[in-house]
A protein has these predicted regions:
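Feature captures the catalytic ectodomains and active-site-proximal regions of enzymes
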Residues: 1-508
């Protein structure tokens, strides 16, 4: 017998704001199907940033955090918040993994290297954590500390790297410890789509001291801007002598978000790595991950291991004999699987996964439809198979194209999502099921700064929540992403487990 599926359709980066004109690609797009859903079915908006998703007040949401909260059915306090708290309360100074690995380098007369994204974006890393680890290194008596700075320009303004590097240099001057040894744009150092040629350039700067040589980081970033290369695309370069990573050194990867830290970590830690040839083989360093990037990764230690989440939606469905499909293109596949399952890599019994390859283009403004048509077509087939009780689906376009800062491309991205949503929602309704349409955070609804320059980061805006085919129900205001799973479960025919402290968005 065919199942009547319950679908959660996540339009990644589709935020909602009263500003319907300036720089709002969501409002500017021709999206007749999504508009019709919002007019016909019950709709509200829900919070997807700040304390509502376990981040500091005013901190924009992101895909990892959003999917974790949606899958958990409770507010999950994020690594950003937990690490910041440990610094403020003096707990970082006692962190056993950091203490042990810093001490190993100091006692052997070797260097400590901090590597990671710089700035206050708060999506992958945070300046406060850099400052905390630097203060700890000084406290422990470290003499040789080198910083390998990855510039952002996606989760922060494309020219904000200059200021972030200056802030970091000011901290080094204040402490009297540390030098910025290299600068690299995240396009090279934080790829997540197996573009090993990019990562090799960053690795060569870190380990071999290869790339353009500059007197300091300020000179490097100015040269990059002069060459029309914004923060994301800074070519890996070297900014001081003697800062190469060598055997016996300690390397601390400052990023707490896993997806864009895994590839570089694999280069350093995996003996079986074959993405490119590591001259002299794997570097014999003491490697510390600020958070867990991959539970199976060898030759590294985790400073802040994940908090185990019990009875997340995927686990709960599986234990109650329900079948589920997770489907997305490459860019968001980890989000509908690993993050949605609370950081668990392996699928649960009855959980099928489907990844559609993301297009191989330099930047997604060149192909704003991305792989949405293919994701929708595959999802429609799977719905029609009658096999699944629950479908978790992500369309990546509004976020990934939003990050390019190209307004016209973002409009096309929204329009591509509209066509894709039409295909899958129609299929679910035809199968007698229901769907919940939402987003994990904002992005495409703000593509321009007030001065007209591109805005490439996420936003703190609310996101839409539409209950489609759920009957004539009322939706409350003031909900958040953690409330989605408890809203879905009655339609799946299951009670809400005690661990899910979120509250249904549907008013009884």
């Amino acid at each position: 017998m065919s199942k009547k599926p319950v679908m959660l359709c996540i339009m990644d980066g589709f935020g909602w704001t009263p500003n319907k004109t300036y720089g709002n690609a969501v409002a500017a797009a021709n999206k007749p199907f999504i508009d019709s859903l919002m007019a016909k079915y019950p709709m509200t908006t829900i919070d997807a940033s700040g304390m509502a998703v376990g981040l500091p007040d005013g901190q924009m949401g992101n895909s990892e955090v959003g999917h974790t909260n949606m899958g958990a059915g409770r507010i999950v306090y994020q690594q950003l918040t937990l690490i910041t708290k440990s610094i403020r309360e003096g707990e970082m100074l006692k962190n056993p993994v950091l203490v042990k690995n810093m001490k190993a380098a100091i006692d052997a007369g070797k260097a400590i290297h901090l590597m990671g994204l710089v700035g206050t974006g708060g999506v992958h890393s945070h300046a406060d954590h850099w400052f905390g680890v630097l203060e700890m290194a000084k406290h422990m008596g470290a003499k040789e500390v080198y910083l390998h700075c990855i510039t952002d320009g996606r989760d922060t303004d494309p020219h904000s790297g200059k200021g972030f590097l200056a802030d970091l240099q000011a901290k080094l001057d204040e402490l009297g410890v540390g030098k910025i040894a290299s600068v690299s744009g995240r396009y090279y150092a934080m790829d997540r789509d197996n573009n090993w040629d990019r990562e090799e350039k960053a690795y060569a700067a870190f380990v071999y001291g290869e790339g353009e040589q500059y007197a300091n980081a300020a000179e490097a970033i100015e040269a990059s801007y002069a060459n029309d290369k914004t923060d994301e695309f800074v070519l890996p370069c070297v900014t001081c002598e003697g800062g190469r990573m060598q055997d016996g050194d300690t390397v601390i990867f400052m990023n707490f978000r896993p997806d864009r830290a895994r590839q570089m970590t694999r280069i350093f830690c995996d003996d079986a790595f074959t993405g490119f040839e590591r001259r002299g083989g794997r570097k014999q360093v003491h490697y510390v991950c600020m958070a867990e990037y991959d539970a199976t990764m060898p030759n590294c230690e985790v400073a802040y291991p994940p908090v185990e989440l019990k009875n997340v939606l995927g686990q709960y469905l599986s234990e109650n004999g329900k079948t589920q499909l997770r489907i997305a293109e490459t860019e968001k596949y980890a989000h509908v699987t690993f993050f949605f399952n609370g950081g668990v890599e392996a699928p649960y019994a009855g959980e099928d996964r489907c990844v559609i390859p993301s297009p191989k283009v330099a930047t997604y403004d060149l192909q704003p439809e991305m792989s949405a048509p293919e994701v929708a077509a595959e999802c429609k087939q799977r719905i029609e198979s009658g096999k699944y009780d629950v479908i978790i689906l992500n369309f990546a376009n509004c976020d990934m194209v939003g990050h390019t800062g190209v307004f016209e491309a973002a409009v096309k991205a929204v329009e591509a999502v509209d066509a894709a949503v039409k295909e899958v929602v129609t299929a679910v309704l035809d199968a007698g099921g229901c769907a919940f349409l939402t987003a994990d955070h904002g992005n495409a609804e703000k593509m321009k700064n007030p001065d007209g320059t591109p805005f490439t980061a996420h936003t703190t805006n609310v996101v839409p929540f539409v209950a489609i085919g759920c009957g004539d129900v009322k939706l409350r205001e003031g909900g958040c992403l953690a409330d989605i799973a408890p809203t879905m479960l009655p339609y799946i025919g299951l009670p809400v487990p005690a661990e899910m402290t979120g509250k249904s968005i549907i008013v009884e």
